[in-house]
Amino acid sequence: MTETFDIAIVGAGITGCAIARQLARYDLSICVVEAGNDIALGASKANGGLVHAGYDPAPGTVKAQVNTRGCELYGTWAQELGFLFRRTGSMVLGFNDEDRAHLEQLRRNGQANGVPELSIVGPDRIHELEPRASADATCALWCPSTGFVDPFEVAIAALENAVANGVAFMRSAPVEAIEVAGSSDDARFTLATPTGNVRCRYLINAAGNGAADISHMAGAEEFQMVWRQGNIVVMDKEPRTLMPLYPCLLYTSDAADDLIGVD
């Protein structure tokens, strides 16, 4: 069986579901194609849920533009879709003059990217904001707009809204091959899956860990995935709203090409 749509979105993680929800506003036929048997089973299910404010990306990059705007929009999305979003704020801690210079650079990045209310604060303000921060911290970049979500909850809310507005959802449908033919005026892409084929005019690659494979099959840009892993250690079980704290710099170990730091 083959179904035809204007747009096919490969991947039902938080990114694919959010894209589907936004595109459902338009008069388009859309299908989300997911390899797993449910949504958000890839990277979306196993990350910290931090909504970055946008002071890290280099000004002028696409990431800088979408990062700041996305953080701003999360408050609106939370109200519209009914998921929990907490603006806890965050601090990047510094311990010496070198760290302070790096924090100033992050502040300049953030200001250029449109991040609101960034400031460099001293020890008194650090411990007022987070009493359990290191007593050795001499300065910090304070960013009030950083927030937290549950990525699984956001993905569910976004896709439920999209499906309610006519978006089709195929699960247990890993893309095995992509045939490319014709122009954008026709059903240019044909996606082969175990549960049936999907034809579409436009293909959106939101496949997360499998994005490079989808890009290769579609004859698009070849790229290599660079994997990252963060480890979160729970050291305090007291129920309270926690603020994310970061060291100023990440250091490469002498033994291997590993980055050592706290996330």
Task: Please name every model-derived segment.
Residues L84-V92, H127-N165:
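Helix-loop-beta segment of a Rossmann-like dinucleotide-binding subdomain
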Residues S145-E179, R188-P194, R201:
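Helical element adjacent to the flavin cofactor pocket in flavoenzyme catalytic cores
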Residues I7-C31:
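N-terminal Rossmann-like FAD-binding beta1-loop-alpha1 element of flavoenzymes
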Residues I30, E117-L118, L203:
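Hydrophobic anchor at the start of a short beta-strand
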Residues G49-L129, T138:
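Dinucleotide-binding Rossmann-like beta1-alpha1 core, especially the glycine-rich loop
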Residues A18, I178-V180, A187, L191-S253:
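Flavin-dependent oxidoreductases
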Residues R25-S44:
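Glycine-rich FAD pyrophosphate-binding loop
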Residues Y251-D263:
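Single conserved hydrophobic/aromatic residue that forms the stacking wall/gate
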